[in-house]
Amino acid sequence: TATTGLPSAFISAEIRDLPIKQGGTGVIKVQTIPGVTLGGILVDHPLNFFAMEDGTQVALQGVHALLPPGIYPLRLDAILPDGSKQSYEQFILIVSGNYGSEIIPLNDPSTIDPTTTEPELQQIISIVSNTTSNLYWNSIFETPAAYPDCYTSRYGTYRTYRVTNTEIQIPGFHTGLDFCGGDGLPIMAPAAGQVVFAGALTVRGNVTVIDHGWGVYSGFWHQSAIQVQVGEMVEQYQVIGLVGGTGRVTGAHLHWELWVNGIQVDPLDWLIQTYP
């Protein structure tokens, strides 16, 4: 926590859990004098600040799993009531997430064709890029799966796809957390929120996306059944769908993805500590 060396608009500034790992979530908490509007950047991502009940302003920002480890800027910008601007900048360390690698057998090469995957990814990005000021969750996130401690693939692993004995290298990583479990098992909402997408996509299969507020979104891929509708408010633990094998899969499982201000982060972090 910094309290000295700050411009006069700032009372204190805290960056939680330094250094931040690849795939981690940066938490920036700032106290200012009254009437200040906050902005800034972490790495190269614009920060969105929201007021907590005690008056502290907080921003949450995901760090990309493929961002090279190193030193990156954090800048805080304060706009005063008279329109003047004060800034505070420091450098923070991003460290390796120590993610492994895996080879994925694939039956249908079309599901990794960029002409298929890129438009679908952009559709998801457009959904999760809307930042709502409502905060719907008020406790630690809970596992969405029936088998909470059984994973078939962790977040962050580098992936190579194998099609009939030919390995196809597509630059990328596993963007979520895959849980064990077969067709028809229930999927629970890890935290409260509002359903902003519910439908079928080519790669992700039957998809539900929940807005938890403050730029935090959960995505659930490959479902056999969707049991919620767009616009519906869901509570933590509510059953929102059933595990399936739709889309680009090697078998039925739950893929849970967590986005924080436009970046996919490691969902396990959100299961072991409370944000913000």
Task: Identify the role of each PLM range.
Residues 64-66, 184-185, 200-201, 246-248, ...:
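Short polar/acidic secondary-structure junctions
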Residues 189-227, 252-257:
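Zn2+-dependent peptidoglycan hydrolase active-site motif and core
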